[in-house]
């Protein structure tokens, strides 16, 4: 790799570190090509990406970034799993690590916050952005349906009372 290519890689990695909601660093020693392709496909499906980069270039790209403390994790054969959604990459990495013992999560960063192994696991258990939006919409919609039910209740109560009176009259 010549100097221009290295500078381009450093620039790309810098953009990744700035724009990603979460970056997970893991060792991937011993993974087969098909296993790496599976990891990439899972990350892509979740809206994330996977990148293998030289540790030295990644450390240069981290200089001056909010997640600079993550540079200590960049030793050995490392892979970066990242996404704009702060939860997606962590979930993909955790799920993949459970199935592949050769994939060892070291930690990562979420914005300015450095994450250790337990931190990545905790982030992976959080609801995704879509799940949070769905629950907020559900909370907003619930009062409206309750009001509609309360407005319709007197009419249904009257109908129920009238049908009971009618049944009693027919029985007598």
UniProtKB/Swiss-Prot annotation:
A Pfam family the protein falls into: Ribosomal_L10
GO molecular function: large ribosomal subunit rRNA binding; structural constituent of ribosome
Keyword RNA-binding found: yes
Gene3D superfamilies: 3.30.70.1730, 6.10.250.290
GO biological process: translation
Keywords from the UniProt entry: Ribonucleoprotein, Ribosomal protein, RNA-binding, rRNA-binding
SUPFAM superfamilies, sorted: Ribosomal protein L10-like
One cellular-component annotation, GO: large ribosomal subunit
Tree of life domain: Bacteria
Complex formation: Part of the ribosomal stalk of the 50S ribosomal subunit. The N-terminus interacts with L11 and the large rRNA to form the base of the stalk. The C-terminus forms an elongated spine to which L12 dimers bind in a sequential fashion forming a multimeric L10(L12)X complex.
Similarity field: Belongs to the universal ribosomal protein uL10 family.
Role this protein plays: Forms part of the ribosomal stalk, playing a central role in the interaction of the ribosome with GTP-bound translation factors.
Name recorded for this polypeptide: Large ribosomal subunit protein uL10
Protein species of origin: Ruegeria sp. (strain TM1040)
